């Protein structure tokens, strides 16, 4: 028996602790408001300014300005639909087969004990709606530019900013952001570690810093993944109901850093987060490919290498269907392409299954959703194709480079005369912040802009 396996006699009765529906601030429902806690969370996210801003943030810049392309808002809606479908699929008996073999426990018993762990539609949609709200304008270029400017103050990263918006910045409360339930916040945290620890150790690397943003070697400043130290208080509150063993295990990295340029990644995430992340990966790999095909960013010739790679994966479904799907993806008939996209999404969703992560005390950490190795390999082919031919597309890179320059210059300008140039609310926050926290206020302001708003402000300056 492997180290992390659990005997049937060790299976604890399923109990979801009531603390997972607690909020940082007392927040009783309003009169006659009978909504469950996660439905209230969903409403707060949907009605937030940060969520609305996603409609003006482009998912893939090279695809251009037309009525078809996806924004981060439409992407988030599609992730929510896929996430809900994954939750529905995980209720079926066959999704427990692999876990049943791992634990040597009858799959019917597992289904009975674990189904109540699954997030409600309100909860999974909340996570999917929220997952991108911390991403700054101009994609990875904008993210890396802000990390460059914040390197000595804890760095910047989109997932960390999402947690910060939910727990501090969104003005639903004065100082606790949207004041969401603990379980919703747990589901948003993909990387439960401090960003400054997970990121490359810039102080040791002595990378060149150039005051002219045109000449910054931006790839030296790609951030790691984690939580800002500024938000440690809320992160500690989030995990305070876990046992000491669970907290330590949950925040472990996959490996020990071997050199200061290396980014570290955490090993674990919650069940809810694993479902949301799968939904995001499927939407990225399949729907972003659809955008690129429709708008002519990629062509059948470029697809051939991916087609060959997919045929080599040991999957009966792929062997039987990939020729037809590849043909229909690039068909002149729109309905054929939509059928191919639908078949691919269905393939990924219907292969989801339960897995054991480690011997956590908390069941929401002990189990995750996963795809079998051959299906992960297939999804990896799609994601790599999008990365190689869409994200790395020269038009995308030029737009991100332009955005990186704009954000870096704006940061420098605001930092030079914040009391004159920042909006009043932001200026008040800047003035009230301690000296070591003032740059974070400027960073929050720039990160919250849409692509178009950032361009307008830059032109004003």
Swiss-Prot record:
Signal peptide range in chain numbering: none
Ranges for region Disordered: 22-41
Key words, A-Z: Hydrolase
One annotated GO molecular function: dGTPase activity
Sequence ranges assigned to domain HD in this UniProt record: 72-285
Any Gene Ontology biological process: dGTP catabolic process
Biased composition (Basic and acidic residues): 24-41
Superkingdom of source: Bacteria
Keyword Hydrolase: yes
UniProt cross-references to Pfam families, sorted A to Z: HD (PF01966), HD_assoc (PF13286)
Keyword Glycoprotein: no
Cross-referenced InterPro entries: dGTPase, dGTPase-like, dNTPase_2, HD/PDEase_dom, HD_domain, PHydrolase_assoc_dom
HAMAP family per UniProt: dGTPase_type2 (MF_01212)
Family indicated by similarity: Belongs to the dGTPase family. Type 2 subfamily.
PANTHER family: DEOXYGUANOSINETRIPHOSPHATE TRIPHOSPHOHYDROLASE-LIKE PROTEIN 2 (PTHR11373:SF40), DEOXYNUCLEOSIDE TRIPHOSPHATE TRIPHOSPHOHYDROLASE (PTHR11373)
Protein name, entry field: Deoxyguanosinetriphosphate triphosphohydrolase-like protein
Organism per entry: Haemophilus influenzae (strain 86-028NP)
């Amino acid at each position: 028996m492997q180290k992390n396996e659990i005997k049937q006699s060790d299976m604890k009765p399923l109990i979801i602790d009531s603390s997972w529906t607690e909020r940082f601030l007392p927040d009783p429902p309003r009169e006659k408001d009978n909504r469950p806690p996660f439905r209230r969370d969903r409403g707060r996210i949907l009605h937030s300014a940060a969520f609305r801003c996603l409609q003006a943030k482009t998912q893939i810049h090279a695809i251009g300005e037309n009525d078809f392309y996806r924004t981060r808002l439409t992407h988030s809606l599609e992730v929510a639909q896929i996430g809900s479908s994954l939750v529905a699929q995980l209720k079926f008996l066959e999704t427990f087969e692999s876990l049943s073999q791992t634990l040597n426990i009858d799959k019917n018993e597992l289904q009975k004990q674990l189904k109540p762990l699954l997030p409600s539609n309100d909860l999974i949609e909340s996570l999917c709606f929220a997952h991108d709200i911390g991403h700054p304008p101009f994609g990875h270029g904008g993210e890396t530019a802000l990390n460059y400017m914040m390197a000595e103050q804890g760095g910047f990263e989109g997932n960390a900013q999402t947690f910060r918006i939910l727990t501090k910045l969104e003005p639903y409360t004065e100082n606790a952001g949207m004041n969401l339930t603990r379980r919703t916040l747990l589901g948003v945290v993909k990387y439960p570690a401090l960003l400054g620890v997970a990121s490359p150790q810039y102080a040791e690397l002595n990378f060149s810093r150039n005051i002219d943003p045109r000449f910054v070697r931006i790839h030296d400043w790609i951030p790691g993944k984690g939580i800002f130290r500024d938000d440690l208080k809320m992160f500690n509150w989030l995990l305070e109901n876990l046992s000491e063993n669970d907290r330590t295990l949950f925040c472990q990295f996959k490996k020990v850093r071997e050199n200061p340029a290396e980014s570290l990644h955490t090993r674990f995430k919650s069940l809810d987060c694993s479902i949301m992340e799968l939904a995001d990966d499927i939407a990225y790999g399949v729907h972003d490919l659809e955008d690129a095909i429709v708008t002519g960013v990629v062509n059948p010739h470029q697809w051939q290498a991916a087609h060959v790679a997919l045929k080599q994966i040991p999957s009966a479904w792929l062997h039987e269907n990939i020729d037809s799907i590849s043909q229909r993806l690039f068909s002149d008939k729109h309905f054929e392409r939509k059928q191919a996209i639908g078949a691919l999404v269905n393939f990924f969703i219907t292969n989801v299954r339960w897995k054991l992560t480690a011997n956590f005390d908390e069941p929401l950490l002990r189990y995750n959703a996963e795809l079998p190795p051959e299906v992960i390999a297939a999804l990896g082919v799609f994601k790599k194709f999008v990365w190689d031919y869409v994200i790395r597309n020269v038009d995308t890179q030029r737009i991100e480079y332009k955005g990186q320059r704009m954000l870096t210059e704006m940061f420098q300008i605001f930092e030079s005369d914040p009391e004159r140039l920042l909006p009043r609310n932001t200026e008040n926050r800047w003035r009230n912040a301690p000296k070591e926290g003032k740059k974070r206020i400027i960073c929050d302001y720039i990160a919250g802009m849409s692509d178009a708003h950032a361009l307008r402000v830059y032109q004003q300056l």
